[in-house]
């Protein structure tokens, strides 16, 4: 049967197999098996063809054939990415026959596409007015697209790329990177040169701006900030205003943290009309509905996290917000929840004491206090309650509430646990008020009040692109950190929101959050285990260099552009740096913080320098990087590998993920072809496959196979250098509440500020319908049980009696695993069954 292909203009032409084969051959250039793969893809493609197939369907069919072979060799992903890139090039630039012609087309069309974006009122007219477009066009390098994986190309094109008013794509990837660079240099004296410098870094995936910046930079709606943190006040006008603000910030793609701790409890009196309050829950449900009504950038639902202090009288209902059962009008289906926990509560859990819940109307100052001041005032209110001088309160056991929090965490992954006293005591910008909450992803820690909606602007260094010749390039990391801080500082003067309190706070504090991603990627390339001392020292050293360079650059920018307005009176002005905050927290808490204090760089010189001024109130925060990590083609944030082979579902579709580092190591050992089917059969788990050496198994333990104390130790080592916080996902195999209590207590003891999602290992797995397996074969190996140490080996961190490695390590290093506390008596008690 003859097959005809329908072209874009509606005409038909005979299917040309040779033309398709040449396209496939071009996409396999430089790959080891390119000749065999051309034949394989072409033969598998023939099965999918039909008469009348469109050119778009044909392009998609070739890509899908390549993708279905990724499980056999991750290099097929490169083939798929190249094929997709070619379709994007053709639609935006037209046909081409060589890399040289492609580069020429990039340069020829660039100014024309920028002008079209301006004419269609999509792009800022200053992109034409302020820049030497010809010079920028000559700087474009389409070869950088080779760094993108297939999922990165799809994510960049579908989620972040600019579309014309008629829906057609305006940007190829290199136009996208240059548009971002231009949009972040509008305030530079030499915008063209600086844009090229930013472009070089981002197009090489060395660092990436966060999502809102990628969507809106260079456009007529420059809402570039990523995180907004606000507090709802206890009056009807401010509740209504907060709802309005959430709508506008959501429209602009911002993620939101919102504290409801000040709202009076259900049943609390309202004097203006002689009735009683419904409490915060109905207002939270209303805002939850707003998140669905106003999409972020027209692409997905709004995103928000509610925060509540756990002394609030309505906290038990807050715990139920994410439950599937119950009154739907007292549930939040879209918004997340997090609990704001004090040291006082943790100590009462530890000592098995009572915990009192109050109506904020009667204890209105508690919300503004932290540390010792909070504990003293809380004890005063406890006495008042017992004396009958407080109208509404409830007494429970602290351990029972902690148990309830963890059970809710098991069943719904909410509320996330965040520690308010750790956050406030470690803040270097503490002169501008109390920090009442974190943000959507728990990495931002900024003060806020009725007149200030805190704003943070994010970027992340891709560690994978700072690894070469078997080692980390620390000089390159420092260079990236400096340029990223300058870029983020520019962003603050360019971004605009529709909330005046946010714009005011942004200018007064100039907060930025530079983080990292790809940590697990480089750990694997180095052959380390995630739960090893080498891994802990690595993140320690990386973050020390990032921190030093970022702080030093901000001090330089202060000399060039002036210090941020609220600098005077901050701990920066006293010459303190993030490392110094550990001692401040320790002094307030009254117990040692179990974190290593090793240093490598000349911090005394930097302490002296920061006294002279800082351009930014904050500089560092490690975001989850779930989306930009896909573009960067690396592991997100500090997270371990979820699995060696798994299907990832995103807003752009489903994608098969195969760990290229593992495949490369197994290919070098000559056993990939032998063990491939066993890995597929075990759903990416290599621990029970006898043919794989133990050292490889140690390197490639996945999230549920690692000790959760390793996640905490990595976070604690990174946190000592970070002035804000870390989105620290947790992965647990156990459902034992005793284990869970011990784990989260260990996080608090190590000075970790926040945790993020809790992922529980599924009890059951689905049958693999696409994998042929011999079920008579039993994989060797035994499953590790319990949490007695890191991977069942010797403790990875020196015991408390061991000397610190430097003179600055004046506190004992943490033990690899906690004392056998077993959850204060909850050991063996299951949560959600």
Regions found by a protein language model. Give the residues of each.
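Extended catalytic cores of very large enzyme megasubunits
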Residues: 1-833
């Amino acid at each position: 049967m003859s097959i005809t292909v329908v072209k874009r203009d509606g005409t038909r032409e005979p299917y040309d197999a040779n033309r398709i084969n040449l396209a496939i051959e071009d996409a396999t250039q430089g790959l080891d098996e390119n000749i065999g793969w051309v034949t394989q893809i072409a033969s598998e493609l023939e099965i999918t063809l039909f008469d009348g197939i469109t050119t778009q369907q044909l392009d998609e069919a070739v890509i899908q054939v390549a993708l279905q072979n990724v499980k056999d060799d991750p290099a097929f992903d490169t083939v798929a990415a190249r094929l997709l890139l070619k379709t994007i090039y053709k639609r935006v630039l037209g046909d081409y026959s060589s890399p040289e012609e492609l580069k020429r087309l990039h340069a020829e069309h660039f100014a024309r596409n920028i002008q079209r974006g301006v004419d269609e009122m999509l792009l800022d007219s200053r992109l034409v007015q302020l820049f030497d477009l010809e010079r920028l066009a000559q700087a474009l390098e389409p070869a950088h697209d080779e760094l993108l994986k297939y999922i990165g190309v799809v994510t960049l094109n579908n989620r972040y790329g600019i579309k014309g008013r008629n829906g057609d794509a305006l940007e190829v990837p290199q136009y996208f990177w240059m548009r971002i660079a231009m949009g972040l240099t509008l305030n530079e004296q030499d915008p063209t040169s600086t844009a090229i410098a930013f472009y070089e870094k981002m197009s090489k995936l060395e660092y990436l701006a966060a999502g809102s910046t990628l969507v809106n930079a260079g456009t007529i709606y420059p809402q570039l900030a990523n995180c907004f943190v606000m507090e709802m006040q206890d009056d009807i006008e401010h509740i209504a205003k907060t709802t309005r603000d959430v709508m506008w910030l959501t429209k602009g793609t911002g993620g939101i943290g919102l504290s409801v701790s000040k709202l009076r409890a259900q049943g609390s009196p309202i004097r203006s009309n002689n009735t009683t309050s419904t409490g915060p829950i109905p207002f939270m449900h209303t805002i939850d509905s707003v998140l669905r009504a106003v999409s972020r950038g027209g692409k997905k639902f709004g995103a928000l996290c509610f925060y509540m202090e756990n002394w609030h009288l309505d906290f038990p209902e807050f715990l139920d917000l994410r439950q599937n059962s119950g009154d739907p009008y007292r549930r939040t289906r879209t918004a997340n929840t997090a609990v704001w926990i004090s040291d006082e509560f943790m100590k009462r859990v530890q000592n098995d004491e009572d915990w009192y819940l109050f109506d904020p109307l009667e204890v209105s100052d508690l919300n503004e206090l932290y540390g010792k001041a909070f504990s003293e005032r809380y004890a005063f209110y406890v006495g008042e309650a017992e004396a009958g001088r407080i109208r509404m309160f409830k007494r429970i056991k602290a351990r029972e509430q902690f148990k309830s929090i963890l059970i809710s965490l098991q069943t719904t992954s909410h509320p996330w646990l965040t520690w308010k006293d750790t956050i406030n005591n470690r803040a270097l910008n503490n002169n501008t008020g109390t920090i009442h909450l974190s943000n959507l992803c728990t990495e931002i820690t900024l003060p806020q009040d009725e007149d200030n909606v805190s704003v943070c602007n994010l970027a992340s260094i891709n560690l994978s692109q700072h690894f070469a010749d078997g080692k980390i390039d620390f000089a390159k990391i420092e260079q990236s950190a400096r340029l990223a801080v300058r870029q983020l500082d520019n962003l603050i003067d360019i971004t605009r929101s529709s909330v005046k309190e946010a714009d005011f706070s942004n200018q007064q504090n100039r907060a930025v959050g530079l983080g990292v991603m790809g940590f697990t990627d480089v750990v694997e390339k180095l052959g380390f285990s995630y739960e090893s001392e080498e891994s802990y020292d690595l993140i320690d050293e990386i973050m020390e260099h990032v921190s030093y360079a970022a702080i030093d650059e901000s001090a330089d920018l202060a000399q060039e552009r002036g210090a941020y307005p609220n600098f005077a009176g901050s701990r920066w002005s006293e010459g303190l740096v993030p490392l110094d905050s550990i001692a401040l927290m320790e002094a307030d808490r009254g117990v040692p913080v179990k974190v290593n204090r090793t240093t490598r760089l000349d911090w005394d010189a930097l302490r002296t320098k920061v006294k002279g001024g800082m351009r930014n109130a904050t500089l560092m925060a490690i975001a989850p990087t779930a989306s930009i990590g896909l573009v960067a083609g690396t592991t997100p944030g500090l997270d371990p590998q979820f699995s060696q082979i798994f299907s990832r579902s995103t807003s752009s579709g489903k994608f098969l993920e195969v760990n290229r580092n593992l495949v490369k190591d197994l290919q070098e050992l000559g056993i990939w072809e032998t063990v491939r089917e066993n890995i597929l059969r075990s759903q990416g788990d290599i621990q029970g496959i006898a043919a794989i050496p133990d050292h490889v198994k140690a390197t490639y333990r996945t999230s549920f196979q690692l000790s959760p104390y390793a996640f905490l130790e990595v976070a604690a080592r990174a946190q000592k250098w970070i002035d804000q916080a870390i989105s620290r996902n947790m992965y647990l195999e156990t459902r034992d509440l005793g284990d869970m209590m011990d784990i989260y207590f260990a996080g608090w003891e190590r000075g970790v500020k926040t945790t993020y999602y809790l992922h529980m290992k599924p009890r059951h797995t689905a049958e693999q319908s696409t994998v042929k397996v011999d079920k008579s074969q039993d994989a060797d190996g035994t499953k590790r049980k319990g949490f007695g140490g890191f991977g069942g080996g010797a403790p990875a961190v020196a015991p408390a009696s061991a000397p610190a490695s430097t003179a600055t390590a004046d506190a004992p290093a943490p033990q690899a695993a906690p004392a056998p506390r077993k959850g204060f008596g909850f050991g063996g008690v299951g949560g959600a069954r």
